[in-house]
């Protein structure tokens, strides 16, 4: 994998965490690393430069990671609605993971982060990308991770409203 070709945006209000992630990414060979202190600053960076991957903290102010991803995915003037997002947090409760998933996060990484964890999530994004789904109340990567070979119908969930558009 050519990590040296990736453009990665780090969004975290903690400078030490951005430094740690930068060192891990540089050790992998990533050369184009951009930084933002919160979601609002990240949106500004994305208006100027297209990123391959966004790594964002969940808990930041004034615009936290969930709100940032919601804007990234759903705002009419979003600069990168299809950008893959890895959410990083020390608050990895099931509720927070579900919030991140429902906001449109591609991958979730719990703190403390390790180089192995970062590599694994980046590899998942690149080698196993998920198609994007748009339905009445969600836009983002397909939240279903398992494939059921016995499934033959168009819906996986009973009661799915409306038409689902697949976007690549």
Enumerate the language-model features and the residues they cover.
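Active-site beta3 strand of CheY-like receiver
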Residues: 49-55
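Helix N-cap/capping motif at the beta->alpha junctions
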Residues: 35-44, 65
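Alpha4 helix (beta4-alpha4-beta5 surface) of REC/receiver domains from two-component response regulators
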Residues: 22, 67, 81, 92-107, ...
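Two-component/phosphorelay signaling modules centered on CheY-like receiver
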Residues: 15-34
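The feature encodes the CheY-like receiver
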Residues: 61-64, 89, 93
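A short, hydrophobic beta-strand element within the central beta-sheet of small alpha/beta folds
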Residues: 9, 55, 79-92
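CheY-like receiver
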Residues: 127-168
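C-terminal output helix
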Residues: 95, 113-122, 126, 130, ...
């Amino acid at each position: 994998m050519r990590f040296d070709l990736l453009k990665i945006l780090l969004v975290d209000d903690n400078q030490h965490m951005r430094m740690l992630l930068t060192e891990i990414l540089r050790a992998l060979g990533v050369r184009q690393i951009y930084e933002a202190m919160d979601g609002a600053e990240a949106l500004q960076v994305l208006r100027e430069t297209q990123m391959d991957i966004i790594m964002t903290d969940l808990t930041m102010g004034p615009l936290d990671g969930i709100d940032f991803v919601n804007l990234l995915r759903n705002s009419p003037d979003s600069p990168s609605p299809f950008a893959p997002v890895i959410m990083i947090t020390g608050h990895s409760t099931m509720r927070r993971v579900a919030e991140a998933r429902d906001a449109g996060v591609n991958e979730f990484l719990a703190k403390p982060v390790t180089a192995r964890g970062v590599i694994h999530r980046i590899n998942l994004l690149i080698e196993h990308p998920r198609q994007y789904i748009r339905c009445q109340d969600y836009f983002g990567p397909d939240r279903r991770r398992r494939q059921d070979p016995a499934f033959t119908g168009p819906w996986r969930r009973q009661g799915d409203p409306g038409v689902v558009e697949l976007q690549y």
